[in-house]
Amino acid sequence: MLTCEMRESALARLGRALADPTRCRILVALLDGVCYPGQLAAHLGLTRSNVSNHLSCLRGCGLVVATYEGRQVRYALADSHLARALGELVQVVLAVDTDQPCVAERAASGEAVEMTGS
């Protein structure tokens, strides 16, 4: 059974992970499947070392896992439940602030979508 302290610790780790826009961008990218740090860096327009630092934080928070393939490391969300939970969390946040359309909806409509973060 989860104690209050365990729940608080889990929420604090999640909050730490989501507090940084770059980590949020990495999590969103990983919703599409496993990636190598170099792929994430190229996709997000960041340096590989920056991405690696953020991936280290996300691993420490328990949100991503690393799989070693020789000298390369690929990253994925830690659990399929996490992918669903992140999707639900986004929907809840958007439901609270209805003036902020979903990025995917804006992109589908042809509206320019700017992704920020470093």
UniProtKB/Swiss-Prot annotation:
Domain HTH arsR-type: 3-97
UniProt-annotated binding residues for Cd(2+): C57, C61, C102
GO biological process: regulation of gene expression; response to cadmium ion; response to lead ion
Cited SMART domains: HTH_ARSR
UniProt cross-references to Pfam families, sorted A to Z: HTH_5
TM ranges: none
Stated role: Metal-responsive transcriptional repressor for the cmt operon. Binding of cadmium or lead causes the repressor to dissociate from the DNA.
Self-association state and partner proteins as the record states: Homodimer.
Protein name as catalogued: HTH-type transcriptional regulator CmtR
Annotated source species: Mycobacterium tuberculosis (strain ATCC 25618 / H37Rv)
